């Protein structure tokens, strides 16, 4: 019985994507979500970069309408296998977006007009020779940095795509060996004008984000192995960062010149290296970056390791959470919902919501049955976004968040109380009685009337919680900017 109960703890999510972007002709290598706007930027194996703006309310409305149609339509009228969310193929030659689903295309032809799908292309460009290797926004999202297999770093305006600065990174190094290094990761400081770029030889270079000049290099951090991930440790200092490579985690200060790892024979080294994990460390993030007391790392053998910097200064993991045996955890991002959770992207095509406090998976969503999940991110309203070589999915906000917001604002003056399930059952049965028998056009009109009211209430509810989190984030950022240089050291 105990074993059966354990299985039911993992919930297969009922949440669906509001948008799916597909690339049927070129592999997707990287995708970024703007921190403050509904903008997604995608880099491809062909060197192209495309920027799209989407309307979350319109996309959610379309999804809800399809759900209600599926509920109200019975018998022969039911459409099996019809995808309820918008699916668009990206044409890299023209930048156009084309509906993938035949049912949606047929509906547009019948109406005789192109429906506003809630997504538009802002710009597209052939940015790099070869593939796009890494991308990142600056702290405000005004500019985007990208590096390709051509070893050229470019800084461009986010809204227009126009390049404002570029540099051939090979020209910054004297050694012929270093000139041929390929780059794997980009990470921008949120408080200072510099970015970090990691390469396949385990080096991290500090680049001035204004003029793209080389400021410093931290070499051979992971004993010559590739940099898998880089992220900020600003709880300790604005200049402290963590990198992951091969089977170790490293912690360093970007200002240190000629820093060496603190290994046997060099115990005074300024780069703190963890114990050998005997498994590749692929990705990592803090559960709550503002508190930074718990760090989770995705591993090559399907587990997530838990690290506590305040306990042992990141010398070794404290515990582990099993996710999926014989698979790899390739990407990870915090939910930023004050729920002690992170999202993990797995090589089996699933994304897992992992509760670090409980030490277990609490939710599973399927991104792709055939392709691995190579990146996860959050959009400006904290929707999770998953991506692989073939497609990108922007998922709807969790129903838990919507219910939580609704419960806070609800009145307790009702003479009789009903459960949410009872109310939803009553509503759905009413809809079925009213809508069955109508033509498809009449059915859509009736549903649109209801959805307009529902989405206005939902939008107001969601905006309040999002605005609150953004205000807290902005206040913390302002605090960081005005604090003294030795701020937040745990020992002081």
Curated annotation (Swiss-Prot):
It is found in: Nucleus, Nucleolus. The keyword Nucleus applies. SUPFAM superfamilies: WD40 repeat-like. WD repeats lie at residues 127-166, 178-217, 236-274, 276-317, 365-405. Belongs to the WD repeat WDR55 family. Residues 449-462 have a biased composition (Basic and acidic residues). This is WD repeat-containing protein JIP5. Interacts with BRE1, BUD27 and GIS1. Residues 404-472 are annotated as: Disordered. One of its GO terms (cellular component) is nucleolus. The keyword Flavoprotein does not apply. Disulfide bonds: none annotated. PANTHER family: ANGIO-ASSOCIATED MIGRATORY CELL PROTEIN (PTHR19857:SF8), MITOCHONDRIAL DIVISION PROTEIN 1-RELATED (PTHR19857). Keywords: Nucleus, Repeat, WD repeat. The lineage of its organism: Eukaryota, Fungi, Dikarya, Ascomycota, Saccharomycotina. The gene is JIP5. Its main location: nucleus. Gene3D superfamilies: YVTN repeat-like/Quinoprotein amine dehydrogenase. Residues 404-414, 422-433 have a biased composition (Acidic residues).
């Amino acid at each position: 019985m105990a074993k059966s109960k354990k299985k039911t703890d993992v919930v297969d999510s009922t949440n669906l994507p509001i948008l799916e972007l597909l690339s049927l002709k070129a592999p997707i290598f990287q995708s970024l979500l703007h921190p403050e706007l509904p903008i997604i930027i995608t880099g491809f194996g062909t060197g192209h970069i495309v920027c799209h703006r989407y309307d979350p309310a319109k996309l959610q409305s379309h999804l809800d309408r399809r759900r209600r149609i599926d509920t109200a339509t019975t018998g022969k009228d039911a459409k099996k296998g019809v995808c309820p969310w918008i699916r668009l193929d990206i044409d890299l030659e023209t930048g156009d977006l084309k509906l993938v689903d035949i049912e949606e295309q047929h509906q547009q032809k019948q109406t005789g007009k192109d429906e506003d799908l809630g997504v538009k292309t802002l710009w597209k460009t052939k940015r790099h020779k070869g593939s796009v290797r890494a991308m990142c926004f600056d702290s405000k999202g005004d500019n985007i940095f990208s590096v390709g297999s051509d070893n050229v770093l470019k800084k461009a305006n986010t809204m227009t795509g126009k390049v404002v600065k570029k540099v051939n990174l090979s020209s910054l190094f004297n050694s012929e060996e270093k000139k041929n290094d390929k780059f794997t990761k980009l990470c921008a400081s949120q408080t200072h004008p510099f970015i970090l770029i990691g390469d396949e030889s385990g080096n991290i270079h500090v680049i001035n984000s204004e003029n793209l000049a080389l400021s410093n290099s931290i070499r051979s951090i992971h004993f010559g192995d590739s940099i898998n991930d880089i992220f900020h440790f600003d709880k300790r200092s604005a200049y402290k960062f963590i990198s992951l490579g091969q089977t170790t985690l490293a912690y360093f200060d970007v200002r240190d010149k000629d820093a060496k790892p603190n290994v046997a024979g060099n115990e005074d080294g300024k780069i703190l290296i963890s114990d050998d994990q005997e498994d590749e460390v692929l990705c990592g993030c803090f559960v709550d970056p503002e508190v930074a007391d718990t760090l989770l790392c995705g591993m090559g053998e399907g587990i997530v390791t838990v690290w506590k910097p305040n306990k042992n200064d990141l010398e070794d993991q404290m515990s582990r959470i099993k996710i999926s045996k014989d698979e790899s955890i390739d990407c990870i991002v915090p939910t930023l919902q004050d729920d002690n959770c992170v999202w993990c992207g797995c090589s089996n095509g699933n994304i897992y919501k992992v509760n670090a406090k409980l030490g277990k998976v609490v939710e599973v969503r399927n991104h792709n049955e055939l392709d691995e999940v190579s990146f996860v991110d959050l959009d400006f309203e904290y929707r999770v976004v998953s991506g692989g070589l073939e497609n990108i999915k922007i998922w709807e906000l969790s129903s838990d968040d919507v219910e939580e917001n609704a419960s806070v604002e609800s009145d307790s003056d009702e003479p009789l109380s009903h459960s949410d399930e009872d109310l939803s059952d009553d509503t759905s049965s009413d809809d079925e009685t009213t809508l069955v028998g109508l033509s498809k056009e009449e059915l859509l009109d009736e549903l649109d009337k209801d959805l307009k009211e529902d989405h206005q209430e939902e939008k107001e509810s969601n905006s309040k919680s999002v605005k609150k989190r953004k205000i807290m984030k902005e206040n913390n950022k302002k605090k960081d900017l005005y604090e003294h240089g030795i701020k937040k050291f745990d020992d002081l």
